[in-house]
């Protein structure tokens, strides 16, 4: 056996000492003082940032919401069943991030951006902070491109443009979610990525929405974020911010996105719950003073960017539920003042068979004609006024029976226009078909058709056009306007169809 030389031993030891690295992990650690209702009070984290992600030794995570002199109020994701007094909490020195990009499209995620659809992990290296500054004035461009919903009453009377924030407001069970889902279904082939954020909804309702989107092939370009009623208030509060971060990725990469928040009433309630547990002073309706700010900073992130920034857009459709039609409550008035218009859905209209139950008088788009193609403007120019006069006459006829001819004519035309604007759920209509049927109603082609048969007239008109005169629809689609020749051709087609149509 060969003896080890002294020099060899010393050189090996020297080499080991030279290459030795002390593998220690430096972390700022605090202790939980108290934990209740999803909020932990933590002592010993003096350098923590506002809304920094913190890790508990139990594996739970949370964000630092209240930074006090001697403690930190931490909102815990999930229910934190194993967190108790004395549990260690360490800083991550990073703010809340979610996965973004094409990898999330077609998936159902929770508020933290984790998949909950059983289709495996999201493979992406791209993450984005959920709290971002909204684009400034100079980075924006005025809304000028239409975002068609496929709903006649909206595209003709309260048009939505790319980059707009349009509120959908109404009592429960008036078809608010259906309007939003129709808008998502209608984006097929339009190169618009859609994000549906469900806040405080029943799991069964969200599953139904996902099934509908899959049925109409809309999941291919959609993301669903679910913070259901069974999730903690923290998850419900975070969900819309995670959703908008995903939408911003497409906006900032010169693409177009549409985000639906369903609904912000429940979001405000979740935030109220968190704030009261954090012992922040309550204000009107027990909401904290900054409840306006949580919604304004969320909705301001929807924008149409200027050409220098890539001309991308993020359109927001927030939904708010009212109680007994009271739009003057705290949260509805807040969000009405933040958004660029509202679509008001009414219970009375819904139960009288007018669906979508849009109250044309109270609904408004502050973008207006800028978000419409010229053809729609041409056919629906006086539609709002005509419907308003019809409603006035209708109220008058309840007291007076004898009407002059002009009033009778106006009343009959109005009844037919109300029928024209009716639409079945999940059946959005291409803009060229909308132009044709609204033109037919506005120009008196439906005057001889009985009111009950207007919907049937429309159902037969579209296949007739597709079979015999597809060029009419194609021309409206490409020209986006009705010139003299096209209008003459459209009149001829409608007259021909009226001869063949039998009630």
Curated annotation (Swiss-Prot):
Subunit annotation: F-type ATPases have 2 components, CF(1) - the catalytic core - and CF(0) - the membrane proton channel. CF(1) has five subunits: alpha(3), beta(3), gamma(1), delta(1), epsilon(1). CF(0) has three main subunits: a(1), b(2) and c(9-12). The alpha and beta chains form an alternating ring which encloses part of the gamma chain. CF(1) is attached to CF(0) by a central stalk formed by the gamma and epsilon chains, while a peripheral stalk is formed by the delta and b chains.
Compartments (UniProt record): Cell inner membrane
Transmembrane segments: none
Organism classification: Bacteria, Pseudomonadati, Campylobacterota, Epsilonproteobacteria, Campylobacterales
Residues annotated as site: Required for activity: 363
Name recorded for this polypeptide: ATP synthase subunit alpha
Catalytic activity entry: ATP + H2O + 4 H(+)(in) = ADP + phosphate + 5 H(+)(out)
One function term, GO molecular function aspect: ADP binding
Family named by the database record: Belongs to the ATPase alpha/beta chains family.
Residues that hold ATP according to the record: 170-177
PROSITE patterns (UniProt xref): ATPASE_ALPHA_BETA
Domain of life of the native organism: Bacteria
Topology in membrane: Peripheral membrane protein
Gene3D superfamilies (UniProt xref): 2.40.30.20, ATP synthase alpha/beta chain, C-terminal domain, P-loop containing nucleotide triphosphate hydrolases
Keyword list, A-Z: ATP synthesis, ATP-binding, Cell inner membrane, Cell membrane, CF(1), Hydrogen ion transport, Ion transport, Membrane, Nucleotide-binding, Translocase, Transport
Entry function: Produces ATP from ADP in the presence of a proton gradient across the membrane. The alpha chain is a regulatory subunit.
EC number in record: 7.1.2.2
One CC-aspect GO term: proton-transporting ATP synthase complex
Top EC group: translocase
A Pfam family reported for this protein in Swiss-Prot or TrEMBL: ATP-synt_ab
